Amino acid sequence: MTNDQPFRVLGVSGSLREQSRSVIALRILLDFAAQRGAQTRLLDLREVDLPLYRPDRESHSQYEQRISADMDWADAVVLASPDYHGSMSGAVKNFLDYVWEECSGKLFGYICSSHEKGLTVMEQMRTAVRQCYGWSLPYGVSTDGRVDFDAGGKLKNERVELRLKMMARDLVVYGPLLRRQFLSDFRSAESETFAAIYRKQVRAEE
């Protein structure tokens, strides 16, 4: 990112269900981020037919190219997943397997649709992102589709709405600080930084 361009927030929807409550919450968050001047984009994994990740496969489909381009575009990312037996959806995990390099030095937020608060789901997403050199907000947003939305799918829980607004604000405020410093560290010769560890690994794989 540069000082003269808007901050860019990518929302990644990891539910393959139509009218998913997690993606509804994600859209609301992206709207709040846009109100704060961010450029936003939604990557709906329902529309991306990603094969299971195979590190030894050399060919890259148009869908793989799309998710890589979207992640390259993003300065910050919000992952939204349903709670599947206490874990993130397979779609989200498969997505992260593809994009570890593109996660580096970016701030992440997490949304989970769950009737049990989704704490283990968000912690698993946070752990995976940390291993991909990403940074995470210290909280997430949990929604319960049974009580937080009306019959038409509209969010009715004001506390959840306020939490989504808070996350949008924090992404737009803290995200640029982190992104600019990480890019500066990555381009420098300084060796005692988190970015230097990532830089060393990237160059080892070139």
PLM region spans:
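N-terminal beta-loop-helix "entrance" segment that forms/cooperates
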Residues: 45-62, 151-152
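A generic structural motif
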Residues: 36-41, 134-136
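Helix-loop-strand module that forms the ligand-binding subsite of alpha/beta enzymes
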Residues: 57, 62-135
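Glycine-rich phosphate/pyrophosphate-binding loop and the adjoining helix
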Residues: 3-5, 137-206
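N-terminal beta1-alpha1 ligand-phosphate binding loop
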Residues: 2-37
